[in-house]
């Protein structure tokens, strides 16, 4: 476990100016894939939380306390995510920023629920992350979990899938759609949401298949899609397998439009897929780096040599929201903090004002389309 635990990443509490006494410290857990194939996303969560804590502490901390961070590496693995969650419990952590993957967030959040902890995910979009608070959800959550204290800063799969379906239909590509997923709660959840949105408008997918995370050879799948003469390949999954799939489509001469969701929002997608990623379509909220509220923070990141793409600023915002909710509660008690979040807001964040509904979802989710294009000497995603 120690190899997955970032002890050195904790921020050291400062000294009170009066008498140079040590300030009381409130430790927040940050969980994500800091190693492994999705480490680029883990770095986004880590850097965002670190910068937010630095700025919050510089402004006086929270209720006289300085914030500190402790990191748990879940390697995008559900079992490891549960281990990280249990480690947080053992360390007395009561608040968590994370996890990244829906498939890790869901089981880890059960540990947090059982131990009265509050968590905010910057990125997990599966609907059951929050919906199960109010009632049964999907195949695995048969009962409501009213004591769940789980929030997110991002939108949901059903919202993202609706945008994708509208585009496919509006562009006249709906007669030959292949929906492919990676069998994870995120990937299959997103694929199913898109498929359902298409079906709600009378469109049936020509193909619907799942692959396994870690697969590298998709030649048989590509051949099958060529035979079906698909015009659009909708991918529910992350950048690793997505990059390999789009590259092998190009290698085999399949010219179908490749489309996916927020799981490929990393320059690693282009590193893996190469020139074949040009023309890929992707759904993600409007680029947070271009928000006026983020201008100064983006400059700080860029000065440090880090590009705050994708979920970096979402992690920053999650930390801001947590700090503001603790302040509103008057103490660092998870239940009292949650009461300041459910149905409450707005919270002033780097993403703009954010409010929550009674489930822990944000009230203003918005997804737009991006196209992967060559900009200068690199291929990256550009908002349409």
Model regions: which residues?
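Sec/Tat signal peptide C-region and signal peptidase I cleavage site
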Residues: 17-23
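Hydrophobic helical h-region of N-terminal Sec-dependent signal peptides
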Residues: 10-17
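Extracytosolic ligand-binding ectodomains
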Residues: 2-9, 23-384
């Amino acid at each position: 476990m120690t190899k997955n635990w970032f002890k050195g990443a904790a921020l050291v509490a400062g000294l009170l100016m009066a008498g140079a006494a040590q300030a009381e410290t409130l430790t927040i857990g940050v969980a994500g894939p800091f190693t492994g194939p999705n480490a680029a996303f883990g770095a986004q969560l880590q850097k965002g939380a670190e910068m937010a804590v630095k700025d919050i502490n510089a402004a006086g901390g929270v209720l006289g306390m300085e914030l500190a961070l402790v990191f748990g590496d879940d390697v995008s693995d559900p079992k490891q995510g549960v281990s990280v969650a249990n480690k947080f419990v053992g360390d007395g952590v009561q608040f968590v920023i994370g996890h990244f993957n829906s498939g890790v967030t869901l089981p880890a959040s059960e540990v947090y629920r059982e131990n009265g902890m509050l968590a905010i995910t910057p990125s997990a979009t599966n609907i059951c992350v929050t919906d199960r608070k109010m009632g049964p959800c999907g195949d695995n959550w048969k009962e409501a979990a009213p004591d769940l204290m789980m929030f997110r800063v991002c939108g949901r799969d059903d919202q993202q899938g609706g945008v994708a379906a509208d585009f496919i239909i509006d562009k006249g590509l709906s007669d030959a759609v292949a929906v492919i997923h990676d069998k994870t709660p995120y990937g299959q959840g997103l694929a199913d949401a898109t498929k359902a949105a298409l079906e709600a408008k009378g469109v049936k997918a020509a193909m619907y298949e799942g692959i396994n995370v870690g697969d590298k050879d998709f030649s048989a799948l590509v051949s099958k899609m060529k035979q079906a003469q698909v015009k659009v390949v909708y991918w529910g999954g992350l950048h690793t397998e997505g990059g390999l799939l789009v590259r092998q489509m190009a290698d085999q001469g399949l010219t179908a439009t490749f489309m996916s969701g927020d799981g490929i929002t990393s320059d690693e997608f282009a590193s893996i897929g190469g020139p074949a990623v040009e023309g890929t379509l992707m759904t993600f909220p409007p680029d947070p780096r271009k928000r006026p509220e983020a201008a100064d923070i983006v400059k700080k990141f860029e000065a440090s040599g880090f590009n705050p793409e994708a979920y970096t600023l979402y992690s920053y915002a999650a930390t801001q929201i947590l700090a503001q909710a603790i302040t509103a509660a008057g103490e660092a008690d998870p239940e009292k903090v949650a009461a300041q979040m459910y149905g409450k807001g707005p919270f002033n964040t780097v993403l703009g004002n954010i409010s929550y509904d009674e489930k822990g979802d944000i009230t203003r989710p918005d997804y737009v389309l991006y196209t992967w294009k060559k900009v200068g000497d690199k291929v990256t995603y550009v908002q349409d």
